[in-house]
């Protein structure tokens, strides 16, 4: 049995002010590529194998970290469903801490595959609770389960509520995944640009939330206005210019403004250059940039910036995944 999951771009957290009694609220999009693909079958114990090309591409350190995550997820899920073991082979991956949601997709893929193998199927929300994913944004879980363009409703906020302070998903164990409140198929081609930039995670990520939150309420109100009255209608009415204009404006509002300010010069330079002619944003903390518009122009601009800084960067031309994970 094989499972394939999408990646996702995270376009922003709507409310990290919290004065209304809710926080977070994510905006995102599931993508066909890059993806995670895992093959599995029932076994007496747990074994984890990797396609040789992945070891060559990502190196031993990253492969070890993936192996550890896969093993820990498998242990938790097998314990819940009463299974003995599983043989897993990782066929495709994408980098961690790059803004594409690899941690959530990997955990959900392993959990879902094991539950299917043992005919004790669980949905993504059950698996997320077991594995501790989705504590800030529900976009990764929604991308896995449904695909498409997604907005989640965040969490209740305050003493005795879902969340009592500002923190990222990685530090939000035990918090239930945010509900998906809007989902729609997405038709436009998406270009990913992955330059050499800052990778934000762990304690550094927690400290950023502590330092920069709450964000100003007036900026949260602007984000809500743009998302509800321009971005969502643009997706439904297939108006790329309206959608893209919101993407460009979101880079300089709320917590996204913080995320972009902490990125390297090449990332900031790339976004500034792209904004002259097309639509582009930083996915999560980055360094991945997503862009919409003239594909040829986007690729040319990205390569020009790579040349300017003398660095290698990856460009992926992809499209939305409108169905979520696939199993065969």
Curated annotation (Swiss-Prot):
List UniProt keywords, sorted A-Z: Glycosyltransferase, Magnesium, Transferase
Q: Which reaction does it catalyse?
A: 5-phospho-alpha-D-ribose 1-diphosphate + 4-hydroxybenzoate + H(+) = 4-(beta-D-ribofuranosyl)phenol 5'-phosphate + CO2 + diphosphate; 4-aminobenzoate + 5-phospho-alpha-D-ribose 1-diphosphate + H(+) = 4-(beta-D-ribofuranosyl)aminobenzene 5'-phosphate + CO2 + diphosphate
EC category: transferase
Q: Which SUPFAM superfamilies match?
A: Ribosomal protein S5 domain 2-like
> What pathway is this protein a component of?
Cofactor biosynthesis; 5,6,7,8-tetrahydromethanopterin biosynthesis
- What is the annotated quaternary arrangement, including any partners? Homodimer.
Output this protein's name. Beta-ribofuranosylphenol 5'-phosphate synthase
Q: Which organism is it from?
A: Methanocaldococcus jannaschii (strain ATCC 43067 / DSM 2661 / JAL-1 / JCM 10045 / NBRC 100440) (Methanococcus jannaschii)
């Amino acid at each position: 049995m094989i499972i394939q999951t999408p990646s996702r771009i995270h376009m922003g957290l709507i409310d990290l002010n919290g004065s209304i009694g809710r926080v977070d609220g994510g905006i995102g999009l599931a993508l066909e590529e890059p993806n995670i693909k895992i093959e599995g079958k029932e076994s007496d114990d747990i074994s984890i194998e990797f396609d040789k090309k992945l070891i060559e591409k990502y190196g031993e350190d990253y492969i070890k970290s993936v192996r550890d995550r896969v093993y820990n997820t498998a242990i938790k899920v097998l314990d819940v469903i009463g299974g003995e073991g599983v043989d897993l082979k990782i066929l495709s991956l994408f980098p961690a801490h790059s803004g594409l949601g690899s941690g959530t997709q990997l955990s959900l893929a392993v959990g879902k595959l094991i539950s299917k193998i043992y005919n004790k199927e669980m949905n993504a929300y059950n698996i997320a609770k077991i594995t501790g994913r989705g504590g800030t944004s529900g976009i990764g879980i929604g991308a896995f389960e449904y695909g498409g363009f997604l907005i989640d409703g965040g969490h209740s906020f305050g003493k005795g509520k879902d969340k009592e302070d500002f923190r990222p998903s990685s530090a939000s164990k035990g918090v239930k995944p945010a509900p998906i409140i809007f989902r729609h198929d997405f038709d436009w081609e998406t270009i990913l640009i992955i330059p050499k930039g800052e990778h934000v995670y762990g304690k550094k990520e927690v400290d950023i939330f502590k330092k920069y939150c709450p964000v100003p309420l007036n900026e949260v109100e602007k984000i809500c206005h743009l998302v509800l009255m321009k971005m969502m209608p643009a997706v439904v009415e297939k108006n790329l210019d309206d959608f893209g204009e919101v993407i460009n404006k979101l880079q300089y509002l709320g917590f996204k403004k913080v995320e972009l300010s902490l990125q390297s010069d090449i990332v900031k330079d790339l976004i500034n250059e792209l904004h002259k002619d097309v639509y582009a944003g930083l996915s999560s903390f980055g360094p991945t940039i997503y862009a919409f518009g003239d594909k040829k122009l986007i690729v040319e601009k990205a390569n020009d910036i790579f040349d300017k800084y003398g660095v290698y960067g990856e460009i992926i031309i992809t499209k939305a995944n409108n169905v979520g994970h696939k199993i065969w």
